[in-house]
Amino acid sequence: MKDFRVNDKGELEVFASPSSSHTDFDFYIGKWNIRNRKLKERLNNCDEWVEFNSTDDTTHLLKGFANMNKFSATFDGEPFEGIAIRLFNPQTKLWSIYWADSNAVSFDPPMVGSFDGNIGKLYCKDTFKGQEIIVLFHWDKTDIDNPVWSQQIVILKN
């Protein structure tokens, strides 16, 4: 199944999986202790990973068609907080994730996508350091007690 494409106008189009459902993120409801890894620098040929712990508390909203989580961590000795609001559109069968954090204190462009079984893929077209990019959020809930989230960034060629 094709998840997304960039059309002739340069717009991102995302396609829902037939099995996409408002219950796709139910596995994430509750309190989590998370072990994270991130690259020290993005899009700079960096291969140095930084590891850190965080907590996450996720609750249902809007009769199960949305959820919200609060992410808390410490980076370089400073407290860091983030919130994600996830909304499911029953007409399009697409999820939209809106993220804000204590660094930017504003919402990022929404990630949009769906789950196909245990695998969720959500996409966003954005700009990073003046370069147009596509961001992929990849969720794997195959092991419901240890779900895995990862992020990939691809630079769009002009």
Where are the model-predicted features located?
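Hydrophobic/aromatic beta-strand elements that line small-molecule binding cavities or substrate pockets
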Residues: N53-T59, A73, G82-L87, P109-G113, ...
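Short beta-strand segments that buttress and anchor functional surface loops
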Residues: N69-T74, I97-A100, L122-T127, Q151-I153
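Helix-adjacent hinge/juxtasegments
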Residues: A73-P109
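Short beta-strand segments and strand-loop junctions that repeat across beta-rich extracellular domains
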Residues: F25-Y28, I34-N44, F88-P90, N146-N158
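Amphipathic/hydrophobic helical signal segments and adjacent flexible N-terminal regions
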Residues: M1-W49, D57
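Residue-level recognition of beta-strand termini and adjacent short loop/turns
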Residues: L62-K63, D143-D145
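N-terminal leader/targeting helix
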Residues: N45-P79
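An exposed acidic His-Trp-rich patch
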Residues: S102-F128
